[in-house]
From Swiss-Prot:
Main location per the UniProt record: membrane
InterPro entries in alphabetical order: Na+/H+_antiporter_NhaB
Species: Shewanella piezotolerans (strain WP3 / JCM 13877)
Membrane topology: Multi-pass membrane protein
TM regions (residue ranges): 23-45, 66-86, 95-115, 139-159, 203-223, 241-261, 310-330, 349-369, 390-410, 448-468, 476-496
Protein name: Na(+)/H(+) antiporter NhaB
Length: 528
């Protein structure tokens, strides 16, 4: 039977995606202009939910195409403007540069990363110990580096482990070329492969939550932390001290949660590394040690030295994150002899689709701004006073951070609170407490979904996610115990006065100084 033009169009539209998904996206494109004409506010929230839907279906169809179509239509019908989208991209240029250059830079350091993590996995047999090490190490690194950088490191290691096992289990040698994305080989043991996938899922999720636990603690941990610190005129040590009444108990609770979910094997955790896989990784480590030449050793030394530069450069903000990433690419490739354009190109394959997706996401953020979707929530939160106001802000921001980028939510709220301070609605001391509530509210509950944390979204849309069967729904389910514990511990720390009492204690002991209204008035305006 000949194919009609309409059938051919539908077959080509969004490629191999399920037909129901194609019809859903086409329905959204038809419905949105009508709803926007009737009620722009409702249309704005509808668009946000539709975009979340495209993210949830990431394993069926990469979100760039369906999400991009929705964003293009939103601009065309006037929900936002091209200039607003460009403004959002300009404001987040550092994040885009980070994705383009830093992730590629990590690619050229993966020999060293694989060397270090293979030793850890093969020497430490306790899954609970490995999980806690992953969580704590990610938290420590994220306190000084960007969470996306840390996740890029963990992803590079996970892909390395997976490809080694897949290659050997498919009957090939360590040095043979192999496509680890294909499961067609008859030698693969499905049960063993599934167990290994589960093991890698566990480690990646523990590491992902670790980035949130560490990222909330310091002003360099997350992009919104820098914006909040600038508005409040806080320096590195003061920021960490002001956050500590909330972040310290939350960190302890997070590590305890890591232990408990592994111990009792709930929420898809507790997956053990199969003995056969452990043997393959141990054999790989021994093989690499035995066949490591002086050229290989020099490469590892160069990568280690560049790693030291990476940590120092980021911790002391010697340059923007993206530029440090570019320097990592140049240094590792120059001194390790990677000069072929094709070899260089491979490093950029992982991050560029996500970079494009993030640009589309900024178009959705433009709609949120232009349609003032968060305005009612902000006004409602400001109607309360004192400690109750802190709790309401934390909850409201936490809920919004679950569905929208936490950088955007944090920026909008700190600007609104600053405006309230300058209008005389709140005192300067209350502003400082609200800044803590805003920072913790954007960083902690946002682990609930990949929408809130860019690092989680990057993990969901990375090459490793389909290999280890990490879907949107599974990420939400595995993050659930952390979401509940971190959110509740954060609320309790504020609700029962720990934040106010400890802050007062810091004032009384001259560990903190009271700021003035003028300091906020003169602080640098945020990028938004």
């Amino acid at each position: 039977m000949p194919v009609t033009m309409s059938q051919a169009f539908l077959d080509n539209f969004l490629g191999n995606s399920p037909k129901w998904f194609k019809f859903a996206i086409l329905s959204f494109l038809v419905i949105n202009p009508v709803v926007f004409y009737l009620n722009p506010f409702v249309a704005g929230w509808l668009l946000v939910l539709e975009f979340i839907f495209t993210l949830a279906m990431a394993l069926k169809c990469y979100p760039l195409q369906p999400g991009g179509l929705l964003a293009i239509e939103a601009v065309i019908i006037g929900m936002t403007s091209p200039s607003q989208v460009l403004h959002e991209i300009e404001a987040n240029l550092e994040v885009l540069l980070l994705l383009i250059f830093m992730v590629a830079g990590i690619y050229f350091m993966k020999q060293l990363l694989l060397f270090a993590f293979t030793k850890m996995i093969t020497k430490v047999r306790s899954k609970i110990a490995v999980s806690i090490m992953c969580c704590v190490a990610s938290a420590f690194l994220s306190a000084f580096l960007d969470a996306l950088t840390v996740i890029a490191v963990i992803i590079a290691v996970a892909v390395g482990f997976y490809s080694i096992y897949h290659k050997v289990a498919s009957g090939k040698n360590f040095n043979d070329s192999h496509d680890h994305t294909s499961d067609g080989q008859s030698q693969l043991c499905e049960e063993e492969l599934e167990a290994f996938r589960g093991f890698l899922r566990n480690l990646l999720m523990h590491a992902g939550v670790g980035t949130a636990l560490g990222g909330v603690c310091t002003m360099v941990g997350e992009p919104q932390n820098l914006i909040i610190a600038a508005q409040a005129n806080w320096q590195f040590a003061e920021f960490a001290l002001r956050m500590s009444p909330v972040t310290v108990p939350v960190f302890v609770a997070g590590v305890l949660t890591c232990f408990l979910v592994e111990k009792f094997r709930v929420f898809d955790y507790g997956k053990q590394l199969p003995d056969a896989v452990h043997k393959i990784l141990s054999d790989y480590s021994a093989h690499e040690d035995a066949h490591r030449t002086k050229h290989d050793k020099i490469k590892l030394i160069i990568q280690a030295l560049v790693g030291v530069w990476l940590i120092i450069g980021l911790a002391f903000h010697l340059a923007s994150v993206g530029l440090i990433g570019l320097s990592v690419i140049i240094l590792t490739t120059a001194f390790n002899g990677v000069t072929n354009e094709h070899q260089l190109g491979k490093a950029f394959e992982e991050a560029l689709p996500f970079t494009a997706l993030l640009a589309v996401f900024f178009a959705i953020v433009g709609v949120i701004i232009d349609q003032q979707l968060f305005a009612p929530v902000i006004q409602w939160a400001l109607s309360y006073e004192g400690n109750t106001q802190l709790v309401i802000f934390y909850i409201a921001i936490g809920l919004l951070s679950m569905v929208s980028d936490n950088v955007f939510v944090g920026t909008v709220y700190i600007n609104e609170v600053k405006a309230a301070l300058l209008d005389g609605q709140i005192t300067r001391d209350q502003f400082d407490l609200l800044a803590v509530a805003i920072n913790t509210g954007t960083n902690l509950p946002s682990v609930a979904t990949p929408n809130g944390q860019a690092a989680f979204l990057f993990l969901l849309t990375s090459a490793i996610a389909p290999l280890i069967r990490l879907s949107y729904g599974r990420m939400v389910w595995m993050a659930l115990p952390y979401t509940i514990v971190l959110s509740i511990v954060g609320i309790l720390a504020i609700q029962f006065g720990a934040l106010e009492q400890m802050t007062q204690y810091f004032y009384d002991n001259n560990m903190l100084l009271h700021h003035t209204l003028q300091e906020v008035g003169n602080s640098a305006a945020s990028a938004h």
